[in-house]
Amino acid sequence: MPVLAFPGPAAPSPPSVTVEVPDGWDALPAGSDLLRARGTGAAGEPVEVTVRSHTGPVGYAATDLVDALADGVTHPGTEVEPSFVVEIGGREWVARNISWDESSGPVVEVHLAAVVDGPADEAAADEVSRLVVATGRVRGATLDADYDVLQSVLETLVVGGAQ
């Protein structure tokens, strides 16, 4: 009978991740995420960042992940911008902005995904694709100014391991 294990070939340990946040931001309990932080925007609305690990089938790329995340947003009037590539911390990230309106005002969410090298064991590396996804969210009347702060936070992402 097969034995499943964590960490193991189909469930590798998540990579180390760091992100720098402005003074006054709170580190929140991460739950199933790797990191979670929240700050207060210019008009008092929350500015949020989460980082989590994602394991997919072999060949699952960062573009596949941001496409799936965009497909999962079902708010009425959702606008999905084309994905784009950005380099952060020496690593290539695929990013996509998604926006919609809520009763409290506009919301913009940005998803950034990057492939993380697999485990040192070559056989295990052939079983899964390892990725990291960072999600940032801003909302409200000062969305543009808050997005600039969010972007400056996301630009500090560092993922451990080789690229």
Predicted segment positions?
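Secretory pathway targeting signatures of secreted, lumenal, and periplasmic proteins
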Residues: 2-71, 103-105
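Short, flexible beta-strand-to-coil junctions
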Residues: 54-56, 99-102, 116-117, 135-141
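Surface-exposed amphipathic alpha-helical segments
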Residues: 25, 131-163
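Glycine-rich, often proline-containing surface loops adjacent to acidic residues and nearby aromatics
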Residues: 45-50, 92-95, 128-135
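Signature of long, low-cysteine stretches enriched in small and polar/charged residues
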Residues: 66-125, 151
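Short glycine-aromatic motifs
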Residues: 25-27, 78, 93, 157
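Generic structural detector for well-ordered beta-strands
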Residues: 20, 26, 87, 114, ...
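Short beta-strand element of the conserved SAM-dependent methyltransferase core
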Residues: 37, 51, 96-98, 113-115, ...
